[in-house]
Amino acid sequence: MILRRKPIVPDAVTAGLDTVGMRCPAHEVTRAIIAAAGVPVAAPSGNTSGRPSPTSAADMLEDMDGKIDCIVDGGPCTVGVESTIIDLTLTPPRLLRPGGVTLEQLRDALGEVDVD
């Protein structure tokens, strides 16, 4: 989800933009790590820009070997497609990238949704 940035959100999280991207992971291990942190977690994508998103720890290692300290292996992804990106700063909201959440699901939840 792309949302309007609130003043409390640091520049480092938004690259100085007036918007912020927020992801809501479904994976139980990821959610447990975020809950254990006790604060919102800011993190980059799990892939090098321009490369496909990894769907397993092996995929992650292939792309990130030597660039990161560790990988938490929670098993393979169940969806296997890119995350849906929806811009909620616009009226009506605009679907920028389809993914695991379908346009139909978004329209069921939000009503009118434009498509980029």
Give the positions of each predicted feature.
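Active-site-adjacent structural elements in enzyme catalytic cores
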Residues: 1-116
